[in-house]
């Protein structure tokens, strides 16, 4: 119970009570399998690369046939999630273990969390870290071209995208296109099938670049210098120097695996978008977005039924319910 609380919440949750542990002969094989999986992530990462290499899900001649193409690949997505969880368990297990070492039986303090964060951070060649670093390179390119940066912040998202994707953007365009080639499958809420990836809709990314650039253009050199973050490790972090290398390897594996999972999820995003458009064209959906408010099995029912099935209106009602739920605020 305490280990789960620390791993998920970062603190002890008194209401979480661990069930009685199973006998040792049951636990020991589980522990050995878990340790073996943590120590050998490479085969699982290769397997995820193989799943991603299978490529796009084809759009067939009818909505029902397209649904079947998606359904045939669904086991790949389930397997990828399972592989990701196993590979990520190495990095995930470190946090509660280190917090337990620091805090003992007491509640971990902010200082303890800072020490653990310091041990896990700083790994080189972490794929997700380049999301922020790559955006920083684009910002530096814009700042280096003062005539372009001033106009970029005032462009609409569509106009800004067109400019970044054109040769007129010069070096900034090269940086942006390289960034999208590497990270175009990512987004906020990137494992949400309804959330478009940046390659499909880079508006959130462009808005973020514009906001950051606007702030830097309006700040002084002194303000930018004052914003530099202190990266020196907190006191007490040195005691974990021996395991830092292992921690960084675990973080790299986790983030590589997550990127592969997001890439595979993006294949399904594109397939569902195409299927939504197809069902609209067949008169089975009111709009393509409403496909995200049906269960996968319900989409088959809708695609097989004549136009006008009740699930068409059910999807719209569920979307309205979500819109209402998003207005709720809890104290």
Regions found by a protein language model. Give the residues of each.
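Contiguous hydrophobic, helix-prone segments at protein termini
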Residues: 1-331
């Amino acid at each position: 119970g305490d280990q789960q609380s620390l791993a998920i919440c970062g603190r002890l949750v008194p209401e979480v009570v661990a069930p009685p542990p199973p006998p040792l002969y049951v636990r020991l094989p589980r522990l050995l399998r878990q340790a073996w999986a943590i120590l050998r992530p490479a085969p699982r990462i290769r397997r995820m690369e193989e799943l991603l290499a299978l490529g796009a899900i084809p759009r067939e001649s009818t909505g029902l046939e397209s649904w079947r193409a998606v359904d045939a690949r669904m086991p790949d997505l389930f397997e990828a999630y399972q592989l990701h969880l196993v590979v990520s368990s190495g990095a995930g297990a470190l946090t509660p273990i280190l917090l337990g070492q620091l805090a003992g039986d007491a509640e971990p303090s902010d200082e303890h969390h800072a020490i653990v964060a310091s041990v896990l951070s700083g790994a080189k060649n972490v794929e997700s870290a380049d999301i922020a670093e790559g955006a920083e390179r684009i910002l530096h390119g814009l700042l280096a071209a003062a005539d372009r940066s001033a106009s970029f912040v005032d462009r609409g998202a569509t106009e800004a995208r067109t400019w970044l994707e054109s040769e007129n953007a010069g070096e900034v365009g090269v940086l942006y296109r390289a960034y999208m080639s590497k990270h175009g499958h990512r987004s906020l809420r990137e494992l949400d099938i309804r959330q478009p990836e940046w390659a499909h809709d880079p508006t959130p990314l462009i808005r973020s670049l514009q906001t950051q650039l606007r702030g830097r253009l309006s700040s002084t050199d002194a303000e930018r210098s004052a914003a530099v973050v202190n990266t020196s490790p907190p006191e007490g972090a040195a005691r974990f120097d021996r395991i830092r290398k292992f921690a960084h390897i675990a973080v790299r594996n986790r983030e590589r695996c997550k990127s592969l999972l997001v890439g595979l999820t993006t294949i399904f995003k594109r397939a569902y978008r195409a299927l939504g458009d197809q069902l609209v064209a067949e008169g089975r959906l009111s709009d393509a977005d409403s496909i995200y408010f049906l269960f996968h099995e319900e989409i088959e029912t809708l695609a097989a039924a004549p136009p006008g099935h009740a699930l068409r209106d059910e999807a719209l009602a569920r979307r309205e319910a979500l819109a209402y739920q998003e207005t709720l605020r809890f104290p």
